[in-house]
Structure formats: C-alpha cells, structure tokens
Amino acid sequence: MTKKGARGSVSLTAEDWVRAAVEAISEGGVDAVAVEPLAKRLGVTKGSFYWHFKNRRSLLEAVLGRWEEEETEAVISATARVSDPRERLVRLFDEAFADEPFGGHTSGSGVFYGRDFEQRLSDAADDPVVGPVLRRASGRRVDYLEECYRALGFLPDEAWHRALLVYAAYVGVQRLAREVPSRMPREDDYVAYRQHLISTLIPDRTSTAAAGTGGEAE
C-alpha cells in the first residue's frame, strides 16, 4: 500500500511497519504496538497494515525476531570471529557499551532502537509473545559470555559467575540511564567508564592464569 504526501504517493513495506513498531515500543512499551496508532504514525489507513501482517501478534513477532537477530546473534557472530579470547571480550564490550545509554542507537540495517527499547521489553517479560524471546536472547548472551570467559582460561563456575556479573552490569546501565540519568556519565566520561568496565571485568592473561588454576601464573 501507499501513503500520500506532499510529493505524491510513497510505497509502504513491512519494513516500515517494523520500524514504526520499534519506535513505538521505545516510546511507550509493548502495548503501544497497536494497528490504528501505528497507521496514524505512518499516515495511512489500517487497511495498509493487513497487506503485510495478519495481525498485531505477527508484527510483534517480526519486531522481536529482528531485534534478536541484530542485537544478539549478529553481535555474537561478529565477535566470535576474533581469535584472541581477551580481544574477543573487549570487542564484545565495545559492542554492548558502544553508545551512551541515553540516545539509543541505529542497527546495521538502519533500525533505530531507542534508549528504552530493551527495558520496555523487560517490562513486558510476562507477555506470552515477548517473554519467550526475551528469555532466549538473554540466555544466549549469558551463555556466550560464559564461553568467552572459559576460552580465556577460567574454570566453569568462575566463568559463569563472571558472565552473570557482566550481563547484570549491562542491564543495570540501561536501567540507571532510565531511572537516574543525572548520575550516569556522558560523552568523554562515558568512554572512561566503559574503559573502566573493560579493565575491571576483563582480566589480563596473568590474572586469568592465576584464577583459572587457583594458584600462581607460570
């Protein structure tokens, strides 16, 4: 379907609806994904929606599938190609904490995930559509972190504990940016904070060897 503007008709695609839904979630939560408000946002009738999606659930599933692929699987695939275990973790931190948690970021495909997008999903963790995807993505992230720490030389329990600690830091930064933004670092201070996270949570090889063996590094 098309929408009419000052320059005539512009074709709308399923991608347009997905992007509008992502914006709506960032601004108002999962409940904001509703056909009529999204149609108004895009400047079209509700009938346009049904050319691309069967119902609201199918749109929400498309949004969640896109988010899971771009914000979890694509990041894992990109960092997994780094052969050095410590550098792999550093690259992962750079990806996860790349942007200040105040303005959101644009994915590789051009979808803009607003500052609160993942927190809005967390708010809807009991939703029958959102919950399973959220738990799967979060579990995948923690499991991958554990793999990275084990590759760095940590024993399974310690690798698991560090993975949980790192993911808690990631989630916590997002929540603090939403709840007490005045206490969060910005610009150069945020870069320094990210570097502090890296130096604190990713040990050098000497300390890794000691932690992994329970004794002195050779």
Q: Where are the regions that the model predicts?
A:
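Amphipathic alpha-helical segments used for helix-helix packing
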Residues: 102-135, 179
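Hydrophobic alpha-helical connector segments
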Residues: 62, 76-115, 163-166
